[in-house]
């Protein structure tokens, strides 16, 4: 049985709740001592993990829609991507304001350059910013064929973000490895597409170098 447009609308409402409820929990935890001994790190890790969850969910939609033969599921992909960006922005903000502090924001640029795992994180965020800004149908029409080329960069985020997470933790635990493994699996499902993109990029680079 195929999903109807009305059912997809209710699914979107549920996904909005899934994006909002973790924020409400975080606010409650901050105000009621629900965090650990290092609340700043807990906030950073929580926001980062939630962004990763929405990134993985975004990548899951296309293969899932094909597997269960529910093409209307694709309509939820943009919503999930926007929640990924929202949580990634909270993650970056928590680092800038809580780790560095308002008085030390001038150090942010230096930190992002001198710490490789932060460099990967900010690259991922900038890509997500571009994808969020161009996610509307109007931007899709305006960019034409370049829209899909731009949004293929989500696969780069799927590589960089788990590495950023693994690199940022002092002690490797199962959790970041699980996120990395899921990202690899979701990318592996797109092996043919990624191979085609890589070959096309390699050809373009070769042609430019040959000029």
Curated annotation (Swiss-Prot):
> Record's GO cellular component, any one?
plasma membrane
What cofactor(s) does the depicted protein rely on? Answer: FMN; heme b
Instruction: From the UniProt record, give one GO term of the biological process aspect.
Output: protein repair
Q: Which InterPro entries match?
A: Fe3_Rdtase_TM_dom, MsrQ-like
Note whether 4Fe-4S occurs among the keywords: no
Q: Does the keyword Membrane apply?
A: yes
Q: Which molecular-function annotation in GO is an example for this chain? A: FMN binding
Residue stretches spanning the membrane: 17-37, 54-74, 82-102, 116-136, 153-173
Q: Which UniProt keywords apply?
A: Cell inner membrane, Cell membrane, Electron transport, Flavoprotein, FMN, Heme, Iron, Membrane, Metal-binding, Transmembrane, Transmembrane helix, Transport
Name its cellular compartments: Cell inner membrane
The principal localisation class reads: membrane
Highest taxon of source: Bacteria
Outline what the protein does. Part of the MsrPQ system that repairs oxidized periplasmic proteins containing methionine sulfoxide residues (Met-O), using respiratory chain electrons. Thus protects these proteins from oxidative-stress damage caused by reactive species of oxygen and chlorine generated by the host defense mechanisms. MsrPQ is essential for the maintenance of envelope integrity under bleach stress, rescuing a wide series of structurally unrelated periplasmic proteins from methionine oxidation, including the primary periplasmic chaperone SurA and the lipoprotein Pal.
Task: Please give the family membership noted in the entry.
Answer: Belongs to the MsrQ family.
Q: How does it assemble?
A: Heterodimer of a catalytic subunit (MsrP) and a heme-binding subunit (MsrQ).
Its name, as the record gives it, is Protein-methionine-sulfoxide reductase heme-binding subunit MsrQ
Organism this protein belongs to? Escherichia coli (strain SMS-3-5 / SECEC)
């Amino acid at each position: 049985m195929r999903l109807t447009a009305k059912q997809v609308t209710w699914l979107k409402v549920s996904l909005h709740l899934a994006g909002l409820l973790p924020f409400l929990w975080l606010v409650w935890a901050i105000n009621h001592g629900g965090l650990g001994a290092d609340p700043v790190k807990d906030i950073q890790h929580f926001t980062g993990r939630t962004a990763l969850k929405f990134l993985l969910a975004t990548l899951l939609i296309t293969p899932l829609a094909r597997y269960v033969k529910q093409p209307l599921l694709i309509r939820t992909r943009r919503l999930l991507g926007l929640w990924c960006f929202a949580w990634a922005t909270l993650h970056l903000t928590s680092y800038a304001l809580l780790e560095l502090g308002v008085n030390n924001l001038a150090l942010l640029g230096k930190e992002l350059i001198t710490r490789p795992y932060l460099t990967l994180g900010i690259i991922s965020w900038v890509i997500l910013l571009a994808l969020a800004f161009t996610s509307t149908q109007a931007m899709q029409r305006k960019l034409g064929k370049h829209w899909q080329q731009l949004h293929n960069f989500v696969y780069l985020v799927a590589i960089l973000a788990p590495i950023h997470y693994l690199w940022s933790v002092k002690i490797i635990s199962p959790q970041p490895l699980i996120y990395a493994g899921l990202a690899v699996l979701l990318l592996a499902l797109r092996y043919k597409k990624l191979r085609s993109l890589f070959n096309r990029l390699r050809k373009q680079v070769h042609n430019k170098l040959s000029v």
